[in-house]
Amino acid sequence: MAANAEPQQTQPAKHSEVGHKSLLQSDALYQYILETSVYPREPESMKELREITAKHPWNLMTTSADEGQFLNMLLKLINAKNTMEIGVYTGYSLLATALALPDDGKILAMDINRENFEIGLPVIEKAGLAHKIDFREGPALPLLDQLVQDEKNHGTYDFIFVDADKDNYINYHKRLIDLVKVGGLIGYDNTLWNGSVVAPADAPLRKYVRYYRDFVLELNKALAVDPRVEICMLPVGDGITLCRRVS
């Protein structure tokens, strides 16, 4: 969920797990995935941070445990070393990334709220991973513009994960396409946006879901016709679209 988004209003949850964001129609099936595949193999540091984040009032902003596992595996498969994350919150996905990178791997992490990042920082430090993270507080676009202006940064990132303000996803993509290497990946989170991407125009949606829905739809349409990337939209968490740069 976006770093700038409102906290969700209290209502009966479809799943009991914090940050579930699952689009599966069966609670039992999602619980089966968590208990069979995710929780038994979840690193102790990720479990600790997940439980700490569960106590935060905006805990639905966190990356779900199954998506964290997916990202960790993906980064290992592509042998990622130099990465970027836009939208950090308490750092659950950041920790999943740091665990997957080699000891000299790097993550340029950006978020408008350092206070949230510092909730998870002690866990990251205890895991011996803080040296991999370069955290920058503030809006991402000005920093991205600085990076793009220097051509030595072009094509240097193996993986970039975006889980921030949906109304800027298109603006991020315009810049990130130059920074990710050919063959590298950009992952855009929440691209199914609570399932609202297929909801009727008059559907009763929460205010923040309705507000960001059009921006998510705009991104999805743009990625579908962008010849510079190959894409794969996956129903993991709240939907993640992987873009592999080909030119």
Curated annotation (Swiss-Prot):
Q: Per its UniProt record, what Pfam families does this chain match?
A: Methyltransf_3
What EC number(s) has UniProt assigned to this enzyme?
2.1.1.104
Q: Which UniProt keywords apply?
A: Lignin biosynthesis, Metal-binding, Methyltransferase, S-adenosyl-L-methionine, Transferase
Task: Quote the CDD domains the UniProt record gives.
Answer: AdoMet_MTases
Tell me the cofactors it needs.
a divalent metal cation
Query: Does the entry feature the keyword Transmembrane, yes or no?
Result: no
Q: How is the cofactor bound?
A: Binds 1 divalent metal cation per subunit.
Name recorded for this polypeptide: Caffeoyl-CoA O-methyltransferase 2
Q: Which residues bind substrate?
A: K21, D163, N194
- Pathway(s) served: Aromatic compound metabolism; phenylpropanoid biosynthesis
Q: Which domain of life is it from?
A: Eukaryota
Function field: Methylates caffeoyl-CoA to feruloyl-CoA and 5-hydroxyferuloyl-CoA to sinapoyl-CoA. Plays a role in the synthesis of feruloylated polysaccharides. Involved in the reinforcement of the plant cell wall. Also involved in the responding to wounding or pathogen challenge by the increased formation of cell wall-bound ferulic acid polymers.
- Broadest EC class assigned to this enzyme: transferase
Q: Which reaction does it catalyse?
A: (E)-caffeoyl-CoA + S-adenosyl-L-methionine = (E)-feruloyl-CoA + S-adenosyl-L-homocysteine + H(+)
| Annotated family | Belongs to the class I-like SAM-binding methyltransferase superfamily. Cation-dependent O-methyltransferase family. CCoAMT subfamily.
Under PANTHER family, the record lists:
CAFFEOYL-COA O-METHYLTRANSFERASE 1, O-METHYLTRANSFERASE-RELATED
SUPFAM superfamilies, per database record: S-adenosyl-L-methionine-dependent methyltransferases
Could you state a single Gene Ontology molecular function term? Answer: caffeoyl-CoA O-methyltransferase activity
Q: List positions binding S-adenosyl-L-methionine.
A: T63, E85, G87, V88, S93, D111, A140, D165
